[in-house]
Amino acid sequence: MHEDLIKVSSNTIKKPTGQVFVVYFSSISNNTHRFIQKLNYENLRIPVNMEESVFVDKDYVIFVPTYSGGGEFTQGAVPKQVIKFLNNEKNRSFCRGVIASGNTNFGNTFAIAGPILSKKLNVPLLYQFELLGTSEDVKNVQNILETFWKT
């Protein structure tokens, strides 16, 4: 188990209310964006441009790609735009879970942005997928989100 992966106690998990809502960051490669479009849920994209800001006022799960060099190089794994978004206390307060993408070529740092955010925010890491994700990943994430919002 990676040192950044923690077990979130079920009695501390704040369950989301309302409808499924996702917030995500996708670079200009649009890998995460394409995955989000397949989910068919209301969503909000964190801007690539650091000068732009977005704000939320309802519960969401954040989708984050991983940026790092693999191995022990985890510095910069969470995109700066995501950090900026979460540095806003109100934005941070509505986060209920994390889903991360990454590249399995990076071994034990695969999708490490997920465990990092889960630990920092004390919210569950719900799923990790590789790059663009597969159709099976899309189905799995839809099932996870539907269940997470209902229970």
Curated annotation (Swiss-Prot):
InterPro entries attached to this UniProt entry: Flavoprotein-like_sf, RNR_Ib_NrdI_bac, RNR_NrdI
GO MF: FMN binding
GO biological process, one term: protein modification process
Signal peptide: none
Domain of life: Bacteria
Pfam families per the UniProt record, alphabetical: Flavodoxin_NdrI
UniProt family annotation: Belongs to the NrdI family.
PANTHER family listed in its UniProt record: PROTEIN NRDI
Function comment: Probably involved in ribonucleotide reductase function.
Listed NCBIfam families: nrdI
The protein's name in its UniProt record: Protein NrdI
Organism: Mycoplasmopsis pulmonis (strain UAB CTIP) (Mycoplasma pulmonis)
Gene: nrdI
